[in-house]
Amino acid sequence: DCMNAWNRKKAVKIRNPFSTRPWQHVLEPLSGYLHLASLIHQSKDLNGEPFNFGPNQNDKLNVESLIKKLSKTFNLENPYKIIESNNFPESELLQLDISKAKKLINWQPVNRTNEMIEAVSDWYYTYFNQEVDLEELTLNQIEIYESRASKRKLPWAN
């Protein structure tokens, strides 16, 4: 919603600016699923086990903070508008418990919040403005992600 609104130079409409969500880049759960698949290939013990892949608990951001950070790339004065809505009861705090993934398969997220925001905003800005080849940018972001994982000595990356 944000990116489409900002591409049209409009403010995104939000209901609950102080609600917290488990924001993450698509590469985070993808790395978890691929790591899990490689472990299942080696041993069927984990086959059928459910896992959550998400951000660390200390990487929480509320909606307003995320929007303010994401919108910097789009250079908007008023990136959001708060609307009243009683039609959508929502929890103020949503989070994923990734402790099982950390403990059983030694997986943890790679990106810090600021790294996730930079990657997402850059990708969408490029998508809408066609400044560089999107495939090239995507592959470059994957390389950066893998490099971070390797530098942080995550087992699936080494």
Q: Predicted segments — roles?
A:
Residues D1-I40, K44, S65-T73:
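NAD(P)-dependent short-chain dehydrogenase/reductase
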Residues V26, P50, N87-Q108, T126-Q130:
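Conserved C-terminal active-site "lid" loop/helix of NAD(P)H-dependent oxidoreductases
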Residues Q57:
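Catalytic strand-loop-helix junctions within cyclic-nucleotide turnover domains
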